[in-house]
Amino acid sequence: MVNIGAFSGKTIVKPLREALGNEGLITLNYFSASMTFLALLAIWFFYKSAQHSGEGKTFGQIWNALIKVCSNGRLITLIIIITGFWMVQHQLYATMPKYVLRLAGEGASPSWYANVNPLVVVLTVNLVTQMMRKRTALTSMTVGMFIMPISALCMASGNMLDGNTNILGMHPVAFMMVVGIVFQGLAETFISPRFLEYFSLQAPKGEEGLYLGFSHLHSFLSSIFGFGLPGFLLSKYCPEPTLFASHEEWLTASANAHYIWYYFGAIA
């Protein structure tokens, strides 16, 4: 459901931006906030859980469970590793749009390129899960971790190709970005489902839900670092073109723009 929502939401970004300009992106945020609020109301008033065991924990119990998770070296190591994975995933929104628009031109469609990720996940997750069903969760996640650097290298390679030669009608930067996103989506199908499975298996009986909640500590960490680092990297390697007196000066300043993806390849 998450990936279906991710796909459908990004589909309307490009036409909205073309119709309303950057003002359309602000309107889209209002729309998203409104729909999220309606979903919250729907859950509050209409969702009734048939399973109530384990509910009603005190803040003290929750705090003690958090301490247990943070003192488990295996779980903390896994959270840090998965944080690196999601830092790279977040670049679909933190780095990729500006990177593509600045290097491939305003005619590029970064919102549609980002849609490749949920599309790949929806199409392949059942196949990958079936293929890896007899393998351990750690084995499946390890395969995904090996795929992620390939994704970053594909994204970097676009800037090293001749920008005057299109590939399937697309600028090389845009085309290789899509290829990288395909690998990124494939890596996610190996990692995300089995990560939750592994985390739940480490939980004491009856506290699986609580531990699954703490498994999302990686979301907190990856959002902070994943959206903080790109600002520095874009300023250094792929700066805003309007800051330069001429296009030639900007070309010189952004010649190594693909270095950005080397950083994320190392993180992955």
Residue ranges of predicted features:
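Helix-to-loop junctions at the C-terminal end of transmembrane segments
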Residues: 17, 123-143
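Glycine-rich segments within core transmembrane alpha-helices of 12-TM secondary carriers
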Residues: 1-17, 33-36, 114-118, 214-230
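Loop-to-transmembrane helix entry
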Residues: 27, 101-122, 143, 171, ...
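Hydrophobic core of transmembrane alpha-helices in multi-pass small-molecule transporters
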Residues: 1, 165-191
